């Protein structure tokens, strides 16, 4: 897609960012959401992403998946999704666009990411330690199957808002 003739703001931005992604070893990609759902960290399909997510420690939910049906995310690019590479990446959905807590989580996760990488001076860590409460125990979820809605007549059987956990395989969620 990036080498093709198509043009859009997103494609131009992706073409500009790609050389940076080729050069870096670690990536923290911060986002906010438009729908009400709990914050979550997308760790990718590999153990190294899950390990990095656990070192960062926030948010509580870690979701491992094989990527997005509409195209690769930055955290799925190149060495980040290569089990033989030491490169690792995380994407965090910090919460809703309009909520102050989303910005606070973005800042906290950045500090914790830098701390996990050993890039913060001990004096700074001491100052920052008092700003954040110890994180809650994290929960790891693995997406077993990605389903893409292909018909305009699709409807959910319940009012799902995001972050629901479907505990039993084969549970009807829509038709």
Please give the residue ranges for each predicted region.
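Structured catalytic-domain cores with a bias toward divalent-metal coordination
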Residues: 1-175
